From Swiss-Prot:
Pfam families: PPDFL. Belongs to the PPDPF family. This is Pancreatic progenitor cell differentiation and proliferation factor. PANTHER family: PANCREATIC PROGENITOR CELL DIFFERENTIATION AND PROLIFERATION FACTOR (PTHR14572). Residues 20-46, 74-115 are annotated as: Disordered. The modification Phosphoserine is found at S9. Probable regulator of exocrine pancreas development. It comes from the Eukaryota. InterPro entries: PPDPF. Residues 22-32 have a biased composition (Low complexity). GO terms for biological process: cell differentiation; liver development; TOR signaling; TORC1 signaling. Keywords: Developmental protein, Differentiation, Phosphoprotein.
Amino acid sequence: MAAIPSSGSLVATHDYYRRRLGSSSSNSSGGSAEYPGDAVPHSPGLPKADSGHWWASFFFGKSTLPFMAAVLESPEHSAESPQASRSPISCGLAPETMKKQPVMHPSQTNSRAPS
C-alpha cells in the first residue's frame, strides 16, 4: 500500500511554495518576511497577476493579454461561430496537397463496414 502523508507535511509543502512565489499574505509561521530576497523576479514583458491567483482569468474570462482581446474583437471573427470555422486547417502543407485530400466533417459517418 502507498503511504499517505500527514496533513502537517502537506501544509508545510504548501507554505514552502507560497514563500517561494513571494506571497505577501502572512501565516502562522511568519509569512514571506523570512525570505526577503527569495521571491521569483517579475519579467517586464509579462503581465502581473492582480490577486495572486494567476489561473483566475482562465475561468472567469478576464483577459489580461492585449493581443488576445484584439483577436477576439476583430470583425472577421465576429461573423463566425466561436466553436469552429468551416475552412480546413492546412498545418503547413502545400495548397495542392490540401486539394487532393477529401475533407471529412464530424457529422459524416463511415458507410463501409470493416472487413
